[in-house]
Amino acid sequence: MFALSAILSGCNSGATKEAAPSTPSAALTMKDGKYDPPVTISYLRPWGPDVKFKSGEDQDNNVHTKWAKDTLGIDLKNQWISPSTNNAFETKLRLSLASNAEMPDIISYRGEFNLVRELIETGKFVDAGELFDKYASDTWKAAMNEDPSVWYPYMQDGKRIGIPILDYSYNGDPVMWIREDWMKKLNLKAPETLADLETIMDAFTNQDPDGNGKKDTYGLTIGFKNWLNTWMSDAGWIFGAYGTMPNQWNLNADGKLEYGSVNPGTKQALATLHDWMQKGYIPEEAGVYDETKASEEFTAGKAGIVVGPHWMPSWPLEDVKKNDPKAEYKAYPIPSGPDGKAGRHGTSNGNGVVLINKDMKNPEAFFTYQNYLFDHYANPKAGDVFENGFAEGYDWAMKDGKPTTDASATGGYAPEKYTLTFDGARIPSLSMETLAKLASGEEATTPFEKKIKSGVPQPMIDAAKIVLDQKDIAMNQMFTGAPTMTMQMNNDILSKMEKDTFSQIIYGKAPVDAFDKFVENWNASGGEQITKEVNEWYQSVSAKK
């Protein structure tokens, strides 16, 4: 994403030259861990509407840039500033590329994957993997090594062009949220299997769990206006009970990638959903509900079960108490299917990328910056500069002689959002492991653990333990590359075919056996070729070098 000048001048041939690794042009001098004289890092990143500054501060002058200058001798400068809304950042960056404008040292981005691939394919970025191996701290390397496949989206010709921005692992992996007060009232047992769950759904649908004398409740809320396998009000786990996960590429027993929506288990899951629709266990409007709208059926007191991430007590589950102050909800594990299988979609450890301009004079300066955040901010020790947060008066304050992160005391500022990588630094496993530790009744001993304990509701802590206890059932999206040639041509047709067929089967407008014809048509309409291309990509990125 950086230096484009030389690129467009040579693109009339259609060839892309591989960028040579960046080599420091001048040795930097450090005194007491700080560059002296200071070094400047120019950069680009989108600025979202969730980022707010104190009066007198802005993107180039704030508590974070002051910290970088005072502590590390690094002067951070935006090449230009653009908001992330309405694709403004993407539009301006593409215009800069087209006009051969000068690019900054660093581009840090989370958003449109096609833009990332466009930038990588310009050949203007170094093999960041080589720089990472040379300059990254042990803490950062260990965090990255928790899942090396996080590099895959940013690889080209075996080179790691972009450095993945790490996020907390399992953050979107689902658990089953059930109205616990309804469970108690109807004397129901925890569901371990789909059969157990059907008993609960039948009771929620037919035994008046809210006690209002009306038949106005049902079992499970889902929404598949977008997809069945989705981030909230999810139905992917139903397919997991039959050994697959739809709308993603899964690793099969032969070590090959397979599109989950054409796996035979999908037919069984669709038959199950059709049965539940007929019995009134799921909403008749499920096909037009998106994720948020479907979840509102739970918070409105209509549905007794919703499946989604461990953080749902923060939003939107507490809204159920607006309708019924005595309402209770509890997290349960994902149940297994008739053959003992259970599955849920997994969540990537990556959430964005950093690209380094091949013309950056001193790329090691970026690693000095990010290493410090991984070593001191990601999981600070007692007495460390970031023990209570990034900066007093911003994300933490003293109240009654104790540090607090309560927004009423701090003003609700989040200086980690000012950083080059949007969140400061995150060790993927740390958040969920901390939550699981607290759920087991262990004492919070580290600053990170104490911060989590003080700010996270107990149901969320309990749910996190379930997520970790069931980590072996997670099924990750294994294709994370750019759309293949045939995908670009045929994906719209294939997606419409899939959505239409699945919806018709669930609603009973087509027989379950229509799935077999769908698979045949999917393969003939480009799916077979896409499968070949996806596996060629997978072999290229996963091959041992």
Predicted regions and their residues:
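Helix-loop-helix "hinge/cap" segment bordering the ligand-binding cleft or interdomain interface
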Residues: 129, 155-230, 251-293, 297, ...
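Paired acidic/hydrophobic, glycine-rich loop segments that form the ligand-binding mouth/hinge
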Residues: 104-108, 304-309
